[in-house]
């Protein structure tokens, strides 16, 4: 899939453990989309996208210091400067939580996601000649993916329900 890169074991298990200890202390809130509450919990840094009211972008708290080393690792993986990432979304997926088909909002550019703890199935689809073309990727613990170009703009993605606790740390550039 053009514009998609996947890297297993981007970080060491000890770094994952340290991150998870910090993530557990974040002020998560239930994800809400047009009155629907998802099973996942989220917290945004740098910028926050509000789905209510037609979708608005607001300045959010600065990216926490404990995420800066991971931001640098994610930037290196994506072959860009760390400061290119202006938005971070941390998502907590409890057992049974997933996310439906979507594309990240147009205000965001390139995307790097880092997966912690439980593995998940990251699904992609796009309509080609009236048929859905599909790709599934098993995102293991400590892995990362990068979406740019067609993978970012032409393909939708979703995550099947997870069996155990999973954290996703999504770094995004701004357009």
Where in this protein do the model-derived segments appear?
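Non-heme Fe(II) oxygenase metal-center motifs and adjacent flexible, charged/small-residue loops
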Residues: 1-175
């Amino acid at each position: 899939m053009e514009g998609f890169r996947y890297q297993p074991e981007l970080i060491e298990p000890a770094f994952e453990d340290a991150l998870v200890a910090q993530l557990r202390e974040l002020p998560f809130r239930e994800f809400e989309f047009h009155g629907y509450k998802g099973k996942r919990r989220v917290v945004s840094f740098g910028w926050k996208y509000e789905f209510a009211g037609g979708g608005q972008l607001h300045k959010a708290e600065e990216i926490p210091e404990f995420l800066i080393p991971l931001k640098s690792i994610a930037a290196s993986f994506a072959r860009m400067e760390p400061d290119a990432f202006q938005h971070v979304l941390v998502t907590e997926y409890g057992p049974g939580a997933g996310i439906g088909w979507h594309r990240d909002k147009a205000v965001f550019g390139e995307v790097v996601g880092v997966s912690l703890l439980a593995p998940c199935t990251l699904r992609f689809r796009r309509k080609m000649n009236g048929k859905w073309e599909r790709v599934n990727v098993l995102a293991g613990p400590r892995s990362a993916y990068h979406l740019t170009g067609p993978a970012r703009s032409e393909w939708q993605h979703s995550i099947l329900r997870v069996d155990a606790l999973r954290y996703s740390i999504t770094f995004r550039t701004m357009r």
